[in-house]
Amino acid sequence: MQRGFSRSIDPVIPQEITITRVAIATEEDAKKKNTEKGRKYIIPYGLYRCEGYISANLARKTTGFSEDDLKLLWTAILNMFENDHSAARGKMAVRERIVCKHDSELGNAPAYKLFDSVAVQRKPDVYDARSYLYYTVTVADTLPEGVTCERLS
């Protein structure tokens, strides 16, 4: 299993916010009654696309990656932000997986053609997207022979 780096669909603009820490961490802090100030950078909203590959041929010959492993991987990807909430990640969530499968172990089409068949676009009447609902995700109606795509949420 290989995954590329995620890229934002639209440009993202980090915003700097000031934070104040009021928690007393040591006895000395309690005596001084100090607070700490700092800065934090956030991205108010971003929709990211990540692409990945699984080689059925390598799974059979080398790694032993199985359908059970794939099911476990999908569960982990879907829940990767659910069990590790953090102010740093806000409300990050996996929204959709589009999975292409080949009839042939070596593949029926190059990966780039399949990635190109998936389009993510901001809706025309939206200037600043602040929700997944502001985007349209489409998969081409015509795929290479021997390839199927399934949309999983």
Give short role names for the model-derived ranges.
Residues M1-S153:
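Basic polyanion-binding and macromolecular-assembly surfaces
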